[in-house]
């Protein structure tokens, strides 16, 4: 029986598999960080879904609406800030507008790219979420500790910056 891999190619016998280069300590640690981030992401998304329900939103709606709380932005700007696809943000933005949680405004800087802005109903939904989110983040934050969270945040921001500047350079994934 022939075994096929995820991309559809035939899986060769194990004896013919390529050997990966040995990892440095930093590379092995980064691998563990990535795998742990997958686990953390799943837990955070589960919690976000429950928290967002307090405002009548989904986690994805909360994420997109959160991208325009401080100022109106284009869908492309929101997608870049959130690190998600433009098409996904557009689909959710249209739903938010349809439900009155956001609105499209004329963009003086670009005729075709409208600005997405939060409405009073959107701000109200976010306030309802904040009422349940703050006690949750306080409780979890106290268990981890402010100093550790500050250090973690700085490291995560640095890693994001390294990965974002890696596009087209030797740091890119492929």
Regions found by a protein language model. Name each.
Residues 44-88, 99, 171-174:
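N-terminal helix-turn-helix DNA-binding core of bacterial DNA-binding proteins
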